[in-house]
Design a protein with these regions (language model features):
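Conserved G1/Walker A P-loop phosphate-binding module
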Residues: 1-111, 141-143
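Short, flexible surface segments
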Residues: 96, 350-351
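Residue-level signal for pocket-adjacent positions within structured domains
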Residues: 22-32, 39-41, 49, 53, ...
Length: 361
């Protein structure tokens, strides 16, 4: 599976600059609203040093890391649901994303205009969330009557209709669905086919200046503002510069800015964590590769990510943890140390498992 994250935010908050840094693209990043009109899609490799080590051990010809797809859409303004700015039709471009990354301006720069005339992260987040809520309300207002008719003639799911109405009530209260789903015991699976934006996990990406990046206290204030959602802090312009540098130069620049991890790596890591994802590894002479699965997936489900036939034909899996294989230096030595196991259909995969699946016809 490929993880897809939709990037939203007001105009001029640094969305396109961040997207350029993420993807190495050069989409228009301008100092005026609506520089991005058509959605930009980019696929980003997830950094994983384990793959380099696996390629060394197995003599792999190539390395294939797990990937994240990012979709950058036009800036949203207050009143978009009623046609302000470019309206909200382009939100359809991110409805199938697994998560929403909301980019929030947290930097002062008189040369970069703010669409509302002032830098106010709380107000900006409220504007975006309100527009996403209104977009979801429009979707539910169309879906509920159709499902009510289906339920009346015994062709619809009454429990699903209840969930639709409960979600509508949450939105009418001015809240995102994801923020209250747990407390309301909402069955999110009933909403899946609607691809509601506010039912997706949120990540808040604060495009910040040095005053915030160097202050744990200020970062904590913003974290508290968005909790229980995850927050990422970065300087989009710095991130764009980092991707132009060598690995060593980038590390030095990060250290100069008091950071031990780039914002892009942080965003990818948080995206995985937010969605409950992990990776397992495969390796051989041709390639060393990372595969994305959900935490809690079984060995057959993991095999199915490679090919659906592998899940159906799963017999067993030869498994060794990356840590044990790294220490052993070869599969032969890992086996000699008793670190390689044969696992069956009920085995729950662990992050960093190195696997060789045995598949029947």
């Amino acid at each position: 599976m490929a993880l897809t994250i939709g990037i939203v935010g007001l105009p001029n908050v640094g969305k396109s600059t961040l997207f350029n840094a993420l993807t190495g693209n050069t989409v228009l990043a301008a100092n005026y609203p609506f520089a991005t009109i058509d959605p930009n899609v980019g696929v980003v490799n997830l950094p994983d040093v384990r793959l380099n080590r696996l390629a060394e051990i197995f003599g792999s010809e190539r390395i294939l890391p797990a990937t994240v797809s990012f979709v950058d859409i036009a800036g949203i303004v207050k009143g978009a649901s009623e046609g302000e700015g470019l309206g909200n039709k382009f939100l359809a471009n991110i409805r199938e994303a697994h998560a929403i990354a909301q980019v929030v301006r947290a930097f002062d720069d008189p040369d970069v205009i703010h669409v509302d005339g002032k830098v106010d992260p709380a107000s900006d987040m409220e504007t975006i969330n309100t527009e996403l809520i209104l977009a979801d309300l429009q979707t539910l207002e169309n879906a509920i009557p159709r499902l009510e008719k289906a339920v009346k003639i015994k062709k619809g799911d009454a429990a699903q209709l209840e969930t639709y109405k409960a979600a509508q009530k949450i939105l009418e209260d001015g809240d995102t669905i994801i923020s209250r789903a747990k407390d309301e015991k909402l069955e999110l699976a009933h909403l899946k086919e609607l691809n509601l934006l506010t039912a997706k996990p949120f990540i808040y990406v604060f495009n910040a200046d040095e005053g915030i990046l160097a202050s744990e206290e200020k970062q904590q204030e913003l974290r508290d503002m968005v909790a229980p959602a995850e927050a990422v802090f970065l300087d989009a312009k710095l991130e764009a510069d980092l991707v132009e540098l060598s690995e060593e130069e980038a590390r030095e620049m990060l250290e100069m800015n008091g950071q031990d991890e780039s914002g892009l790596d942080q965003l990818a890591r948080v995206g995985f964590s937010t969605l409950g994802l992990q990776t397992y590894l495969t390796a051989g002479p041709k390639e060393a590769r990372a595969w994305t699965i959900y935490k809690g997936d079984t060995a057959p489900q993991a095999a199915g990510v490679i090919h659906s036939d592998f899940e159906r034909g799963f017999i067993k899996a030869e498994v060794v943890s990356f840590k044990d294989l790294d220490e052993a230096g070869s599969m032969a030595e890992a086996k000699a140390r008793g670190k390689v196991r044969m696992e069956g259909k009920d085995y729950i995969m662990q992050d960093g498992d190195v696997c060789d699946f045995k598949i029947g016809g």
